[in-house]
A protein has these predicted regions:
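Amphipathic terminal alpha-helices
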Residues: 276-278, 282-296
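Glycine/proline-rich active-site loop of Rossmann-fold NAD(P)-dependent oxidoreductases
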Residues: 131, 154-165, 200-211, 233
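Terminal hydrophobic/aromatic helix or amphipathic segment near a protein terminus
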Residues: 216, 220, 224-271
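A conserved pocket-lining segment of Rossmann-fold NAD(P)-dependent short-chain dehydrogenase/reductase
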Residues: 167-188, 204-205
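N-terminal Rossmann-fold NAD(P) dinucleotide-binding loop
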Residues: 13-14
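NAD(P)H-binding glycine-rich loop region in Rossmannoid oxidoreductase-like domains
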Residues: 35-94, 201
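Conserved beta-loop-beta element that borders a ligand/cofactor-binding pocket
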Residues: 103, 135-156
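Conserved Rossmann-fold NAD(P)-dependent oxidoreductase catalytic core, especially the SDR/UDP-sugar
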Residues: 85-130, 145
């Protein structure tokens, strides 16, 4: 029986664990709280993944080590390198294949559709931290691949849309959004991202490069309108937050202050090309309405 380790306990980690377990493969999930889904083939362990010796012990014998874990948003520049170094060391010691969940911050502002072959040219601290994690893993000689997702949406998502947009839309309230309302963005569903992680882990030609999770590309206004129509809520009222709004909110909550780097790129659509994922890994995007219906 194949054995995999997943570092993380969020929606993507849990869905990935269930996909593997439902195929009869054993999974050990590692997180500080020991969370994860209830399944006979899923073992949940409370441990700190930055404790490299403990992580190595828990990953011994694993065919694959998946990571979906990230530090608190405002602490990425300081803590993500520590976590990434621990994960990479554990992979080196155990010989497990390494599958990373990433995002698009490492690309920086890009014009036109982004392929996974684009250089990682971000200059901001969070973007550089993300890029460095992949660059160091790719240069290490281990068997590694990365799946980069857009902004998450749908059931289980933790994102700007899920935190700030979906509930006010469903309740018919004014929606304050810290990004441009009519600029296209690529959104990834949790299930599609998990399916891509599993598919990449099983495909030999997936290693040594990055892939894009399937996405739906539309503006936040369009996505909010679709959700309202499906749920029977009123036409959404959206208002774009200014940089000054974010600065003031950041005084009391560091999360808001951190959004400047990744959300205020005027006129820059964030559009991911995932055609290679469809063609080679065989994973496509779930229709937008099907993803949104999970929220109703």
């Amino acid at each position: 029986m194949k054995f995999h380790v997943i570092v993380g306990r969020g929606a993507t980690a849990s869905k990935t664990a269930l996909l593997l377990a439902e195929d009869g493969e054993r999974v050990r999930m590692i997180s500080r709280t020991g969370g994860g889904p209830d399944h006979r083939l899923v073992e949940r362990v409370a441990a700190d993944a930055t404790d490299t010796d403990r992580l190595t012990e828990l990953a011994e014998g694993a065919d694959t080590l998946f990571t979906t874990a990230v530090p608190p948003y405002h602490a990425w520049p300081e803590q993500l390198p520590i976590l990434s170094a621990s994960l990479l060391t554990a992979v080196r010691r155990t010989g497990a294949a390494y599958v990373m969940l990433g995002n698009i911050y490492g690309y920086g502002p890009v014009d036109g559709p982004i392929t996974p072959h684009f250089p990682l040219t971000a200059t901001g601290p969070k973007g550089r931290a993300r890029a460095r994690a992949w660059e160091e893993a790719a240069a290490s000689g281990v068997k590694v691949t990365e799946v980069r997702a857009g902004q998450f949406y749908g059931a289980g998502a933790f994102s700007v849309f899920s935190l700030l947009v979906q509930r006010p839309v469903l309740e018919g309230r004014l929606v304050l959004v810290p990004q441009e309302l009519d600029v296209p963005h690529s959104y990834s569903a949790i299930d599609d991202t998990a399916r891509t992680l599993v598919a990449a882990s099983r495909e030999e030609q997936a290693y040594g490069r990055a892939w894009h999770a399937p996405t739906a590309t539309l503006s936040v206004r369009e996505l909010a309108r679709r959700l309202a129509e499906l749920s029977g809520a009123p036409v959404p009222r959206l208002e774009e937050m200014t940089e000054r709004d974010l600065t003031l909110l950041g005084i009391t909550d560091p999360l808001w202050g951190e959004m400047h780097e990744v959300l205020t790129k005027p006129g820059h659509p964030l559009v991911l090309d995932f055609s290679e994922t469809e063609k080679i890994l065989g994973v496509g995007a779930t229709p937008v309405d099907d993803v949104l219906r999970q929220l109703i």
